[in-house]
Amino acid sequence: MPYFDYASTKPVDERVVEAMLPYMTEHFGNPSSVHSYGFKAREVIEEARGKISELINGGGGDIVFTSGATESNNLALIGYAMRNARKGKHVLVSSIEHMSVINPAKYLQKQGFEVEFIPVDKYGTVDLEFIEEKIREDTILVSVQHANNEIGTIQPIKEISEIINGRAALHVDATASLGQIEVDVEKIGADMLTISSNDIYGPKGVGALWVRQGVRLQPIILGGGQEKGLRSGSENVPAIVGFGKAAEITAKEWGEEAGRLRRLRDRIIDNVLKIEESYLNGHPEKRLPNNVNVRFSYIEGESIVLSLDMAGIQASTGSACSSKTLQPSHVLMACGLKHEEAHGTLLLTLGRYNTDEDVDRLLEVLPGVIERLRSMSPLYRR
């Protein structure tokens, strides 16, 4: 069954599962314990930390393990703002961030911080002039994702870093970009970077926040003081081992894989845009190699997804974290689409196990689905 919902979740690579298994049964020690079982657990955690740091060129900072990207984003925004509030209370956040950034930003507003949301153009690229105009003496934090999980647009993070020029901390959510494009904290100038295990075919329930040396955070989960006091709770050793193995594999394979996915992506886009009144969302060139986000006039994306599912093809209308709401995507609305346009969107995200045959099947089925749904729409007239 062709699966085109890799942005929502990915299967765990079998090599990762194999690496994890001994730490579920045989090597089950608590890394805080002062005996050989604990020492073994601590050793493999630090080994994984090193592999993940190497993947993002993170030698100039520390990897803090969390339960996932959502927690990492909360720690970055709330933890940094609360710790550095004496320096200022002005924060800039891109308007198309994942909700795990948007909602912490709104929480900060309730705590007395002034949060301004950075607008984007029709492709979802942030307005650099807005950042340049709005950054001021009391600005302490700017948060812009590396690439958008819904429309695939890659942001000019290096240019943003140059505009900030050390006047505020720069947080970058790289959850969607890791494993798809190069993620190098030094090249882009990030001070904090959010990443997730499952997005590189590791286990769910573990992520990390990379924190540059000298950046100070207030912990948001209190307890035994694990992870250098920034994230209490006994470390999830098997998951961290899996994260490390996934990072090791990604470091070796992402370039070749990205090229293969880009070829499949372009084939889908070229053929789908031949359908009458279909449009590409996101940047036509500066986009993730696995992302296809298209909209079709006169029909709803949810109907397309359900119809594809009946044909054995899995797809999405947008972020799985927000898919239970009937509201149009805040990302597409920020790009200037109307409600009805945003509701007519289909999101196809490719991954490691997609084949040319999967794409063949999609391109065989999708035009008929669109034609059938439009034939039932009172808005559509040939």
Swiss-Prot record:
This protein's UniProt keywords = 2Fe-2S, Cytoplasm, Iron, Iron-sulfur, Metal-binding, Pyridoxal phosphate, Transferase
Q: Which PANTHER family match?
A: CYSTEINE DESULFURASE (PTHR11601:SF34), CYSTEINE DESULFURYLASE FAMILY MEMBER (PTHR11601)
| A Gene Ontology term for the protein's cellular component | cytoplasm
Function, please? Master enzyme that delivers sulfur to a number of partners involved in Fe-S cluster assembly, tRNA modification or cofactor biosynthesis. Catalyzes the removal of elemental sulfur atoms from cysteine to produce alanine. Functions as a sulfur delivery protein for Fe-S cluster synthesis onto IscU, an Fe-S scaffold assembly protein, as well as other S acceptor proteins.
Keyword Iron-sulfur on entry: yes
Q: Which Pfam families match?
A: Aminotran_5
Give the source species.
Archaeoglobus fulgidus (strain ATCC 49558 / DSM 4304 / JCM 9628 / NBRC 100126 / VC-16)
Q: Which cofactor does it need?
A: pyridoxal 5'-phosphate
Supply the source organism's classification.
Archaea, Methanobacteriati, Methanobacteriota, Archaeoglobi, Archaeoglobales
Q: What is this protein called?
A: Cysteine desulfurase IscS 1
Q: So where does pyridoxal 5'-phosphate get bound?
A: N149
InterPro entries under this entry? Aminotrans_V_dom, Cys_deSase_IscS, Cysteine_dSase, PyrdxlP-dep_Trfase, PyrdxlP-dep_Trfase_major, PyrdxlP-dep_Trfase_small
Q: Name one GO biological process term.
A: [2Fe-2S] cluster assembly
Q: Which catalytic residues are annotated?
A: C321
Pathway annotation: Cofactor biosynthesis; iron-sulfur cluster biosynthesis
Subunit structure of this chain's protein: Homodimer. Forms a heterotetramer with IscU, interacts with other sulfur acceptors.
**Gene3D superfamilies from the entry?**
Aspartate Aminotransferase, domain 1 (3.90.1150.10), Type I PLP-dependent aspartate aminotransferase-like (Major domain) (3.40.640.10)
Q: Which reaction does it catalyse?
A: (sulfur carrier)-H + L-cysteine = (sulfur carrier)-SH + L-alanine
MF terms per GO, please?
2 iron, 2 sulfur cluster binding; cysteine desulfurase activity; metal ion binding; pyridoxal phosphate binding
Further comment found in the protein's record: In Archaea the pyridoxal phosphate cofactor is not covalently bound to Lys but ligated by other amino acids.
Q: What is its EC number?
A: 2.8.1.7
Its family remark reads: Belongs to the class-V pyridoxal-phosphate-dependent aminotransferase family. NifS/IscS subfamily.
- Localization terms from the record: Cytoplasm
Q: Which gene encodes it?
A: iscS1
